[in-house]
């Protein structure tokens, strides 16, 4: 066996054992850092929505979403095992988009379209809200960053093992496949 293959096999074994979250932390994506970055991104989203007059802070839809959010927050705090206290925040954006998402640290964004187009009940809003909160609590963004770091590392090891003849087209194709 050649040494590059053995090195690749060892690296793959270590990566597999270490897990995505640990790799994300080794790459500098610890919970605290992610929460700070997410808060900055959330604040930018809120500022832009406010400037564009798409930030909803008073409609009946906003009031329903906010009421559900406020009811669920204490339960989310109780089950938070990330080691970081979340500063839960909600932004409701006026848009026909049928979507909601959460950023690390508990930054929840809801689009009015998900409630209005789907005629969601408060229980259904709670289901969507709870789903988003679980993403934050389970630190799925950190896992995704770790998975991407592992993909990049494996790609680099593979390209190194394949030698210099792979070329940019092969590297670009591999990178597209990783996404």
Name the predicted role of every residue range:
Residues 11-15:
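Hydrophobic helical h-region of N-terminal Sec-dependent signal peptides
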């Amino acid at each position: 066996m050649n040494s590059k293959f053995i090195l690749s096999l060892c690296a793959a074994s270590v990566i597999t054992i270490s897990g995505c979250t640990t790799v994300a932390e080794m790459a500098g994506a610890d919970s605290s850092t992610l929460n700070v970055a997410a808060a900055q991104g959330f604040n930018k989203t809120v500022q832009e929505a406010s400037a564009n007059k798409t930030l909803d802070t008073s409609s009946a839809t906003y009031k329903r979403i906010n009421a559900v959010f406020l009811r669920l927050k204490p339960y989310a705090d109780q089950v938070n095992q990330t080691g970081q206290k979340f500063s839960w925040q909600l932004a409701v954006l006026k848009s026909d988009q049928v979507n909601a998402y959460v950023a690390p640290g508990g930054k929840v964004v809801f689009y009015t379209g998900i409630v209005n187009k789907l005629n969601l009940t408060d229980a259904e809003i709670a289901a969507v809200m709870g789903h988003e909160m679980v993403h934050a609590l389970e630190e799925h963004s950190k896992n995704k960053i770790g998975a991407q770091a592992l993909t990049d590392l494996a790609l680099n090891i593979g390209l190194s093992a394949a030698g210099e003849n792979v070329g940019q087209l092969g590297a670009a194709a591999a990178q597209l496949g990783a996404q």
